[in-house]
């Protein structure tokens, strides 16, 4: 197996799960198993861990763990409920989500996620499904490219970037990461200090092609449904769009059903919140950011499932 990669906020996230030795847990974003190893180290012989990842390379690497308490499944985490049903698991004691692309994916030039390497332009978390970045850029309309880069990358130069990409592909196909980064860099007239001009666009295309925000929106309600009372949900996000979705969802689920303004509905008739927020949002320490600059934008949010009335 590859050398163990320590995920961002790993200690904080696993500690937040308050692991019970005989509990059942889900690592919905296995990656290279950093979180899973830490969870397994805290589980007893009767404990169980279900780990998911849509990347076949992650599942192949995870097979080397060879732990009878670990069940690995190649799947998008939006299918969490179906995976648990297939395993005969109704409720779990904790779920961990580490959103976004993993460091091994970024560091593997062949995957085409990063402009740090000149490689074929792919960006798919599961190379066996969906459309590659090269194929999408070859056919997408200029307006669509602009909208994707603006929406998912929060890039203010989305329009000139899209215009430059469409003009460039008319001369030759955009098939490599270096080629894409160069076109974007030439189109961005004003650069952010300390950031490559292609950063936001690469991020936007990756998020769009892998439907990352849709996946997140789909899995969060399933997490609440599958947690037993007292079970914990820990979510690590690296992008403001992701964190916004997580923050709003957890807040809504903690508040419960709200009566319309000036409508006298008794509180007993309203559905209570299903979650209790646990502490404040956590960020990586200065020491962790110094050791791993990717930790700078990481945010950890934790919530606990509340027992339903009458349960």
From Swiss-Prot:
Protein origin, superkingdom: Bacteria
Entry GO CC: cytoplasm
Catalytic activity: cytidine(1402) in 16S rRNA + S-adenosyl-L-methionine = N(4)-methylcytidine(1402) in 16S rRNA + S-adenosyl-L-homocysteine + H(+)
Pfam families hit by this protein: Methyltransf_5
EC number, as in UniProt: 2.1.1.199
Binding of S-adenosyl-L-methionine, residues: 33-35, 53, 77, 98, 105
Signal peptide, first to last residue: none
An annotated Gene Ontology molecular function: rRNA (cytosine-N4-)-methyltransferase activity
Keywords attached to this entry: Cytoplasm, Methyltransferase, rRNA processing, S-adenosyl-L-methionine, Transferase
Intracellular or extracellular location(s): Cytoplasm
One GO-annotated biological process of the protein: rRNA base methylation
Keyword Metal-binding: no
Keyword Transit peptide: no
Main location: cytoplasm
Function: Specifically methylates the N4 position of cytidine in position 1402 (C1402) of 16S rRNA.
Similarity section: Belongs to the methyltransferase superfamily. RsmH family.
Protein name: Ribosomal RNA small subunit methyltransferase H
Classification lineage: Bacteria, Pseudomonadati, Pseudomonadota, Betaproteobacteria, Nitrosomonadales
Gene name, Swiss-Prot/TrEMBL: rsmH
């Amino acid at each position: 197996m590859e050398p163990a990669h320590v995920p961002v906020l790993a200690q904080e996230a696993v500690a937040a799960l308050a692991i019970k030795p005989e509990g059942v847990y889900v690592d919905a974003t296995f990656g290279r198993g950093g979180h899973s190893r830490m969870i397994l180290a805290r589980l007893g012989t009767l404990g169980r861990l279900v780990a998911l990842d849509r990347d076949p390379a992650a599942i192949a690497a995870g097979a080397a763990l060879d732990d009878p308490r670990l069940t690995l499944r190649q799947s998008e985490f939006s299918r969490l409920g179906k995976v648990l049903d297939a395993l005969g698991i109704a409720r779990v004691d904790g779920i961990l989500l580490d959103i976004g692309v993993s460091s091994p994916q970024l560091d593997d030039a062949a995957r085409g996620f990063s402009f740090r390497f000149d490689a074929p332009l792919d960006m798919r978390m599961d190379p066996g499904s969906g459309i590659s970045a090269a194929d999408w850029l070859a056919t997408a309309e200029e307006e669509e490219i602009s909208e994707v880069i603006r929406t998912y990358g929060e890039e203010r130069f989305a329009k000139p970037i899209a215009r430059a990409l469409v003009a460039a592909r008319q001369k030759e196909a955009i098939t490599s990461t270096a080629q894409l980064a160069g076109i974007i860099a030439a189109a961005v007239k004003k650069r952010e200090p300390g950031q490559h001009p292609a950063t936001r666009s690469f991020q936007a295309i990756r998020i769009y092609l892998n439907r990352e925000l849709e996946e997140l929106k789909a899995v969060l309600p399933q997490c609440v449904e599958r947690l037993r009372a007292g079970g914990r949900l820990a979510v690590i996000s690296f992008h403001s769009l992701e964190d916004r979705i997580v923050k709003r969802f957890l807040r809504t689920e903690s508040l419960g059903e709200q009566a319309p303004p000036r409508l006298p509905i008794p509180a007993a008739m309203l559905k209570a919140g299903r979650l209790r927020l646990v502490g404040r949002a956590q960020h990586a320490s200065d020491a962790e950011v110094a050791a791993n600059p990717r930790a700078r934008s990481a945010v950890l949010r934790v919530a606990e499932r509340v027992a339903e009335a009458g349960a």
